[in-house]
């Protein structure tokens, strides 16, 4: 009589190794309630998840104007996701509404002010530039790097992608070659729908759930809900996908942080939707 212990043991070991290799999906909810009697709130989100990237959730209210400066060797990205206000950069005022992106670029200091009786919430994303980033930055078009980049998400260029359904509206809110190795966009649809499983080991990725977002994110054998106003890190190299149930909303920002400039070839999978001639 044959003993099946080696086979059973082998299956057990494979299953155990798969479990050990499965990476949890880090996600952190962003509180939209300021502490009592406070007019300013700042918290580091998903600390040390991505090398060279520091993310803060900042909330402002009240009449005071806040000054913010870019540290040497860094570039800043502001993603405004709730509330209204104004950013002033070199004497120019930029109206801030929910779902606006702003990059100071060569402007060293900006002023932020909240609209009366409102609270402004945003992510402040600092990217530490490597020596190669500094070299690459010099080759970028000057119009990309010397002026403030400011866009409302709805004004940004739409694109299609094979992993998404025709019902999905995708937009590039920050093209590459503005800040080295970074690009950002949005994904918006109503369920039932999905983003098909895919892998991109050449980049780190964050998702920011926008208003009413209510989806499930899968990465290898793990899954987690992603709700509105939450930040999630896709485990590097994982096969990941997103689903949304009937009558629910999928609406999030993807943020790509490429390991090197060669990885930006991935963006060629995005097919720009040409505007029809009027």
Predicted regions span which residues?
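Conserved short histidine dyad/triad with adjacent acidic residue
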Residues: 54-71, 183-200
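Conserved metal-binding segment of the jelly-roll/cupin
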Residues: 96-115, 226-246
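Bacterial Sec-dependent N-terminal signal peptides
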Residues: 1-24
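Conserved hydrophobic/aromatic beta-strand scaffold that supports enzyme active sites
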Residues: 55-59, 77, 93, 101-103, ...
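Sequence termini and other peripheral, non-core segments
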Residues: 23-38, 43-47, 51-57, 65-77, ...
């Amino acid at each position: 009589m044959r003993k099946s212990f080696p086979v059973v043991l082998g299956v057990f070991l494979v299953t155990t190794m798969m479990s050990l290799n499965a990476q949890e999906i880090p996600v952190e909810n962003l509180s939209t309630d300021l502490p009592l009697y406070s007019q300013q709130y700042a918290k580091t989100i998903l600390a040390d998840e991505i090398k060279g990237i520091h993310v803060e959730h900042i909330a402002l209210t009240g009449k005071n104007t806040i000054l913010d400066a870019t540290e040497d060797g860094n570039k800043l990205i502001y993603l405004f996701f709730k509330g209204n206000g104004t950013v002033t950069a070199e004497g120019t005022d930029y109206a801030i509404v929910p779902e606006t992106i702003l990059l100071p670029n060569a402007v060293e200091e900006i002023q932020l002010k909240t609209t009366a009786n409102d609270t402004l919430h945003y992510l402040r994303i600092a990217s530490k530039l490597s020596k190669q980033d500094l070299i690459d930055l010099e080759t970028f078009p000057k119009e990309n790097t010397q002026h403030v980049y400011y866009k409302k998400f709805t004004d940004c260029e739409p694109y299609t992608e094979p992993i998404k359904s025709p019902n999905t509206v995708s937009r590039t809110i920050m093209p590459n070659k503005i800040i080295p190795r970074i690009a950002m966009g949005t994904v918006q649809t109503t369920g039932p729908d999905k983003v098909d499983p895919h892998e991109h080991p050449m980049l780190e990725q964050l998702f920011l759930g926008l208003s009413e977002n209510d989806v499930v994110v899968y990465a290898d054998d793990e899954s987690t809900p992603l709700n509105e106003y939450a930040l999630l890190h896709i485990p590097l190299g994982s096969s990941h996908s997103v689903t949304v149930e009937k009558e629910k909303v999928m609406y999030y920002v993807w943020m790509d942080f490429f390991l090197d400039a060669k990885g930006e070839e991935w963006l060629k999978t995005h097919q720009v939707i040409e505007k029809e001639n009027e």
